[in-house]
Each structure stands twice: as C-alpha cells, then as structure tokens.
Amino acid sequence: MSPVPLKNAEPAHGGVRTVSVLGATGSIGDSTMDLIRAEPERYQVEALTGNANVAGLAKLAKEFSARFVAVADPARLGELRAALAGTDVACGAGESAVIEAAARPADWVMAAISGAAGLKPALAAVDRGTTVALANKECLVCAGDFFMSRATAAGAQILPADSEHNALFQALASGNRHELTRVIITASGGPFRTWAAADIEQATLAQALKHPNWSMGQKITIDSASMMNKGLEVIEASYLFALSPDEIDVLVHPQSIVHGLVEFADRSVVAQLGAPDMRIPIAHCLGFPDRITGRAAKLDLAKIGQLTFEAPDFTRFPGLRLAYDALRTGNGATTVYNAANEVAVAAFIAQKIRFGAIARLVEDTLNSWVRAGNQAPLGSADDAIALDQQARNLAATLLPQIAAKAS
C-alpha cells in the first residue's frame, strides 16, 4: 500500500452534468463557458442568462444547445426571440424569467449576476438544494446570514468561485473547524501599494484602473485600488465560513500567486497557489468534488522568482478598516458599506469626488446610519434590497458635502 494518501476513486460525477450559468455574458460567465467548451461531452447546458447582450446570449444558447435563456432587460424579449428563431430554445425576459432560469433543474449553477440583481436568482437556485458556484458578492455582503441559513435549510452546497475564497475553501479541507486558528486572504495591494497617502488622495481614474496583475471590470479594479474589494472579501469570508472578524487576516502579496492561506492549531499553514486567472477557481467549482482539466497557464515558480508579503496599511487604505468595523457592527452594516462604496465609486468615475473621498463617503454613510438607530437583522431578500436602496439614498445625500470638502 502506498504511504501517500492520494485518492484513487472513480469520479464522483461520471455522467453528464447539467449546468446553468447566470450571468453567462459577463467576465465570470465567459470563463465558465470557456471551461465547458473544452469538454462539451461532460455537460448539458440547462439555462443561460444575460443582462442586455442579446447577440452574445443567443450565440451561446445555440453553441451549447441550451434549453432556456433569459435576458434581464424586459425590453429585449422580441430581439431575443428573433435571434433564437428556428431553434428549440425557450426564452424569457425580465427578473421573473431570470429567476425561472435559476430555478430550473440543474446539477450545478454558476451565480455570476453582478449587483443586488443577482440575489433573488441565486436564492432561487439555492432553494432547489443544488450546488451553487457563487461569484456574486452581494449575496454574502448584503444578506450573508440570511443567504447561508437558507442554503443550509435547503441542503444546497455553496462553492466559492472567486479566487481568494476558493483558495480558503480548498485549504480548509486540510483540517477541522476546532483546529482552525485563522484564515489569511491575500491582496495584490493594487496600483497604489507603494504610494504616499497624499498621492493616493489625488489619484486619477486612469491611474486607479492600472491594476498590476488582474484584468477586471472598471468598478472592481477601482475597488482593488482602494482595497475596498479586500474589505468586501473579508465580509464574504466571515459569512461563508462562519468566521469572526478576529479569525480573518489580510496579507499584501504583490505577485497574486498565493490566493489564500489557512493556519491550524499545530501552526501548520496550508496555502493555495495558482496563476492570476479566474478559470482556476471556476474549474475547481465546475469539477467539484473531482478535478477537471484546466485552461489556465501552468504555474512556473522558477520563472516568477520570488513571492513577497507585507502587512496592509489601514491608514493609507481605510476602506479595509471600515469593512472590519461594519462586520463588528452587524445588523445590516455590511449592506450599508457595500452600497455606499458603489455610490462613491460611481461618483469618482464621474469625477465628482477625489479618489481619497471614496472611503470618507463610506465612513460618513456608515456613521450616519448607525446614529439613526435603524440597525436590525435582515430576514429576507426584500429586506436586504430595501436596506441597500436606503443606504444608496443616504450616501447620495451626503455626497455633495464630501465633494465640497475635497474641492
């Protein structure tokens, strides 16, 4: 018998796996479809959804013989029907159709609709008790306790599809909950990692969009520059793995090769490494509990040469500190944190505020909301969506005075 404890079992999913991809025309959806495209004999596409890219959605539906597709924009239904004419693909439009797509019978669902619009469809998939690969931050940041309780009640399995939480998910398998001492989420540090605070304050949009490692959308790239994205990931990790804020650390790692680490009681630290390519965590989710053939480049540590680490600076990047504050406040504070940040980032993109004012608007919104005494547990998706809108309105009200201070 080999002393190496490697499994030699038959694949857990030997047959064809039915899959649905919510947000199929976005960046996460594109990576997911790329993996499915590589091994089409393993998958049957049940449902696909998109926001407004009808041509892209119809093209995917035809390529993968999807059974149902939905476009979020109800005004695009006629266009979608025309694009699918002559096929057997059923289609719909609007929120109800997207939720219908999520609730259809599939073994595996990728929940990659961005924003609060992704919450109800993800819940529809969860309620079926299926396996859900979660790439929507709002499900956890805005409704974490409620979302995870609902998943547990339905018997659904939640697989984290983003790189950091997927890394933690893999590393956590090395031990038991009572043996865990902390998890460590890594951050690239973004384009302003070495900048002085005064320079960060005045950073331009073009500078904020120059991420050193990842190719991402505009909003998440700005969040990386402010380290708000890492704050959101701390919040997600807390809900996803039932961890206290004190059990979650952040470590700046400029090379973005080590994505997450877990420390156990015996002081062993287990880490997951990989190239900065979203197809790696998505492939882990798509094959789980088996491993499928990846599409990303192999990791060449000799070529990379060195891996470096440093502590985060909570003074130059206050958005990270605010995430911990929101977690400790609870009762909807993380929802407010996320909503205020979205308003602030939109204002920065529109050149209404300086980069440094993003965190100030988030902090002022949180403080104002706490002073109003409106904190309460969120008991439903509608509660989370209502608080999200309330927080956006509050942030918008505070925005002019933040902008005036910066001028």
Curated annotation (Swiss-Prot):
InterPro entries: DXP_reductoisomerase (IPR003821), DXP_reductoisomerase_C (IPR013644), DXP_reductoisomerase_N (IPR013512), DXPR_C (IPR026877), DXPR_C_sf (IPR036169), NAD(P)-bd_dom_sf (IPR036291). It is an enzyme of class 1 (oxidoreductase). Keywords: Isoprene biosynthesis, Manganese, Metal-binding, NADP, Oxidoreductase. It catalyses: 2-C-methyl-D-erythritol 4-phosphate + NADP(+) = 1-deoxy-D-xylulose 5-phosphate + NADPH + H(+). Mn(2+) binds at residues 162, 164, 233. Catalyzes the NADPH-dependent rearrangement and reduction of 1-deoxy-D-xylulose-5-phosphate (DXP) to 2-C-methyl-D-erythritol 4-phosphate (MEP). NADPH binds at residues 25-28, 53, 136, 138, 217. SUPFAM superfamilies: 1-deoxy-D-xylulose-5-phosphate reductoisomerase, C-terminal domain, Glyceraldehyde-3-phosphate dehydrogenase-like, C-terminal domain, NAD(P)-binding Rossmann-fold domains. This is 1-deoxy-D-xylulose 5-phosphate reductoisomerase. Pfam families: DXP_redisom_C, DXP_reductoisom, DXPR_C. The lineage of its organism: Bacteria, Pseudomonadati, Pseudomonadota, Alphaproteobacteria, Hyphomicrobiales. It comes from the Bacteria. 1-deoxy-D-xylulose 5-phosphate binds at residues 137, 163-164, 188, 211, 224, 229-230, 233. Its EC number is 1.1.1.267. It comes from Rhodopseudomonas palustris (strain ATCC BAA-98 / CGA009). GO terms for molecular function: 1-deoxy-D-xylulose-5-phosphate reductoisomerase activity; manganese ion binding; NADPH binding. Belongs to the DXR family. Its cofactor is Mg(2+); Mn(2+). Pathway: Isoprenoid biosynthesis; isopentenyl diphosphate biosynthesis via DXP pathway; isopentenyl diphosphate from 1-deoxy-D-xylulose 5-phosphate: step 1/6. One of its GO terms (biological process) is isopentenyl diphosphate biosynthetic process, methylerythritol 4-phosphate pathway involved in terpenoid biosynthetic process. The keyword Transport does not apply.
